[in-house]
Amino acid sequence: MKHPNSLSLRRRVALELWRKRMDIAVKEHPLRQLFWECTQRCNLHCRHCGSDCRAEVGVADMPLADFSRVLDSVALRTDPNRVFVVVTGGEPLMRHDIAECGAAIYERGFPWGMVTNALALTPLKFQSLLDAGIHSMTVSLDGIGDDHNWMRGNPDSFRMVDRAIDMLVAHPEVKFDVLTCVNRRNYGNLDDIKQFLVKKGVKQWRVVAVFPVGRAAADPMMRLMPAEYRGILDFIKQTRKEGAIPHQLRL
């Protein structure tokens, strides 16, 4: 008698082929993403910052020439078109040469993107990034109005990220997502954030919990309760059923 949980021959073969592909991938471990922390400086003072970034730090930005040599070395070993360079910080827009950096990455055949708080993302700066071949961007939104400003420590933060989202929606050639860090203050307003993003035309939204390091480690407002973690999961489940906006979830 066939066991109810047994696999068919076809499925067993497919599973074995998948396992072999995974074994090869683990052994080869091909490079697919390269993160460049191009600066430790930041123009905000976020409550949850894991690196305690500030406007002025004692560490100089990595020179573009140095990172260019890294890229040239990587290009000798792998296809640049298959390695996505993610420019992070600190806040990448603190660098006066950020567009030049992006152009240097793009000219070497690497697709690239940026993670930004959008405070310094003016239309002129955004155009310079487009001219430099930017492929993608992640911007942060942790609430509507004062909720976001409270999290980011700046009264202009919400206004600027609101404008940044509008600019990104108007340029569909740039893939982008919005990142929301859930905390005790904005937990009850996730539906408001969702409705705001849907009306804006946002297609990708990442909802994450705050990792308790850096400033977040000493801030009780960043520590979710077990019931709140469960509530996030229920919220994601319901939102996925609605289908209004795609989701990614990381806890």
Q: Where are the predicted features?
A:
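Radical SAM enzyme [4Fe-4S]-AdoMet core and its adjacent flexible, acidic
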Residues: 1, 132, 136, 140-142, ...
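Conserved alpha-helical substructure of the radical SAM core
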Residues: 2-136, 224-228
